[in-house]
UniProtKB/Swiss-Prot annotation:
Induction: Repressed by thiamine. It comes from Schizosaccharomyces pombe (strain 972 / ATCC 24843) (Fission yeast). This is 4-amino-5-hydroxymethyl-2-methylpyrimidine phosphate synthase. The modification N6-(pyridoxal phosphate)lysine is found at residue 62. It comes from the Eukaryota. Keywords: Cytoplasm, Iron, Metal-binding, Nucleus, Pyridoxal phosphate, Thiamine biosynthesis, Transferase. The keyword Nucleotide-binding does not apply. It is found in: Cytoplasm; Nucleus. Homodimer.
Length: 346
């Protein structure tokens, strides 16, 4: 085996927002940087932090809240960059299912992806005068949208650019308007000020980072090049992604990519403000101890980073407007490449 080989585990099966990872492969950026990256997909997304944290895989992707929890549970992992920033996440349901505000979950069947989704739901129950016994929790994994469609649950925790799009497309196929899909955003319900707990991160085993800093930097340079290519020409780079991953050519995946586009990190950096918010939120949920320090670094990024966002709440509102316009008019495949800010290095 080449000593320059890196094993990389995605957070679940190939999705539209994995494009930069595969594009860096197809455009030869890993090879240019002198590394060979074996891209792996998990059969169970819940195994990702354990596999990386045990050293069986070098690096991969995971959401921020899972990355914090993994370190608190003894898995030595650290985030060294971000892929998808603050995708809107919340309780998704269909009009007519009887859930118009959070209190309406009483007596309902509510789906969640994994362990921390249940913890978040129970925390919100205490905020809204409910108890965990007031609703039926059903673990659905990544299949929130099909579970709603099949009537197995009345609503479930999902991401706007993924599960919500899947449910919207089903509504259209049934002659129903997209507006029949509703989301109660967790950041608003919990007064977080951001949806950063579901930011998708690049993470690695601490020992791998310590022993191979040059590999981390090389990987990031390759990913940065691929990310900038994607932001400059999303249509062409997505065509290349389809050539590598045929399933990405479906109308569902193309639309999910359009809705992911505004969330892509431009400079791949960890955002300290977001990490502080999610760390404090995780402490409140009891996921990590009170003395926990964020397990992230920007020390391996070798380019100028974007300036700190001066109005993060304003950014959230602007992105919400962008996402609504894309939902109504189409995104990059309709010539609409809206995103919140222009990348600094384009």
């Amino acid at each position: 085996m080449s000593t320059n080989k890196i094993t990389f585990l995605t957070n679940w099966e190939a999705t539209p927002y994995h494009l930069p990872i595969f594009l860096a492969q197809t455009r030869g950026y890993y090879e240019r940087e002198g590394i060979e990256v074996a891209i792996l997909e998990p059969t169970n997304p819940s195994d990702v932090t354990a596999l990386i944290g045990s050293g069986k895989v070098d690096m991969g992707l995971k959401a921020m809240i899972h990355t914090l929890a993994a370190k608190a549970r003894g898995y030595p992992v650290t985030s060294f960059g971000s892929l998808l920033n603050e995708p809107f996440t919340g309780l998704i349901t269909l009009k007519g299912n009887g859930i118009n505000d959070f209190k309406d979950i009483k007596g309902k069947r509510i789906g969640y992806v994994g362990e921390f989704g249940k913890i978040q739901l129970d925390d919100l129950c205490s905020k809204f005068g409910l108890s965990p016994s007031d609703y039926t929790a059903i673990r659905c994994g990544m299949n929130i949208a099909p579970a709603i469609i099949n009537g197995e649950i009345d609503g479930g925790i999902g991401i706007e650019c993924m599960q919500q799009v899947e449910l919207e497309r089903w509504c259209v196929s049934q002659g129903r308007p997209r507006s029949d899909v509703q989301m109660l955003r967790i950041d608003r319900l919990a007064n977080l000020g951001c949806c950063c707990f579901c930011t998708i991160l690049y993470i690695a085993h601490d020992e791998f980072i310590a022993k191979h800093p040059d590999k981390i930097k090389a990987f990031l340079r390759a990913i940065h090049s691929a990310t900038l290519d994607m932001l400059k020409d999303p249509v062409q780079t997505y065509k290349e992604y389809i050539h590598f991953k045929r399933e990405m050519g479906s109308e569902l995946h193309r639309e999910q990519f359009e809705r992911c586009f505004a969330y892509f990190s431009h400079d791949i950096s960890n955002v300290p403000r977001d990490w502080n918010k999610v760390t404090n939120y995780s402490k409140r949920l009891g996921i990590i101890p009170q003395d926990f320090e964020p397990n992230c670094t920007n020390g391996y990024l070798t380019w100028e980073l974007d300036p700190d966002e001066k109005d993060p709440m304003g950014k959230q509102e602007a992105i919400a407007e962008i996402q609504d316009e894309i939902k109504q008019k189409g995104g990059v495949f309709s010539g609409n490449s809206l995103r919140y800010v222009e990348p600094a290095n384009l």
